[in-house]
Amino acid sequence: MRCVRAILCSCLLPVSVTLAAGNVSFDPNLPAHSLCTVEIAVLRPTQSAVGMKEVEFRAKKIGKMTATQLEHYLRKHVAPIAIGPGGFPYLLDHQHLARALLQAHAGKALYAEVKENWSKLSEPEFWARMKERDWAYLHDETGKPLSDPTSLPRTIGNMRDDPYRSLAWLVREKDGYSQTESPYAGFQWADFFRARVHLGDGTNAFDEATLEAMKVAHSPEAKDLPGYVAPPDRISH
């Protein structure tokens, strides 16, 4: 537990937005269902990558908020965490939000809810439970499975960019599919597009890829993916 407490102490610097009182600061001994504030610097990701297009969009949105607006926004987006071996908090959702806050230099902490405190488990036991709950996406930024959970980045700032995750977000924003509660739905769509849509490096690469991805998103091949939306001519009225 000393390692986490030491990091926490070093992170308590002035921030652009100071989260309001009413929540305790993160502590490795907090029980499940506790609400707290947690420094982004100590959060450990449960996925390797984010879509940087989405991160950049959210960072710009956050950058335009007043301190009061951002405070309300963060209270509406409470981050679920699981406390793992060594007392480290693992971020189970809102990884794009956490990365966007770093990008915007707008804040260094999130409101969080402890879903489970598994700090007493061994590493293998911890990851077995994480997999059982579907609380980790153990693939790299190209969609390939990780050989081991220890291959995950250790910090939010070190998460890598998966361009196809950005493409999946762009398609969802255009109603190519619906947002769902299904875990890691964006990555399922990213892998679907990865196998079917070319994403180049040019200035218009994402625009061109989005047009193509919108077509395949409505195809019969995609019907089993979370949030699938049938093409307009197939929707019964």
Named regions from a protein language model:
Residues 18-22:
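Boundary at the C-terminal end of the N-terminal hydrophobic targeting segment
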Residues 7-17:
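Bacterial N-terminal signal peptides
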Residues 24-72, 76-88, 102-237:
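Surface-exposed, charge/polar-rich loops and edge strands
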Residues 90-93:
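Short hydrophobic beta-strand that contains or immediately precedes a catalytic carboxylate
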Residues 1-5:
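Positively charged n-region of N-terminal signal peptides that target proteins for export
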